[in-house]
Amino acid sequence: MKEFCNKRTIFYGGLVALILGIAGYWLFLSSFSSAKEEIMLRVDRDDNCDSIQAKLERVASPRQMLGFRILSGVVGMKKVRPGCYIAGGGISTLALFRNIRGGRQTPVKLTIPNVRTLGDLAARLSLQLELDSAQLASAFSDEALCQELGYDTTTIGCMFIPNTYEVFWNISAKDLMARLHKESNAFWTSKRKAEAKAAGLT
């Protein structure tokens, strides 16, 4: 009788463990979104846990959101870290939660277009970043910042090389300027400078 009870205890214990394992996988380890393509979640500086969940509800099912809410309640997300995070493409609910909680964001592709004015550039870049056009325009007209990079407010436009770069969505205006300055220096090799001079472009 005792042996029978032990076997029954082991059986039910194993059954409970199996059910919990399946539920855990179903809630936390399966894909957060059924979308095969990458879905970018943009977390603003004024977002909180509730507003993040509201954004995620647009791309996730109730089951996936239940897993995310359980993690938020048990583990917690005291400090919201702004940035751009992948919420599709097969990422699990647990991985997405860890990325958002830890601030492990995904870089975005920033395209520098051919435009006529710095105002146009600020407007176009603001569509791709958290920065708004006013913040970008302010950086472009910041005399001290421009001088620090070797330009002035009338020549700073020469620093922006039309191309596509990877940057963090919530990059600051100053860090963006420093990054584009680095890209400009990398572009203008001695050979390119000589070619530009020969063509009368400098």
Residue locations for each model-derived region?
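Conserved catalytic or metal-liganding residues and their short signature motifs at active sites
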Residues: 1-202
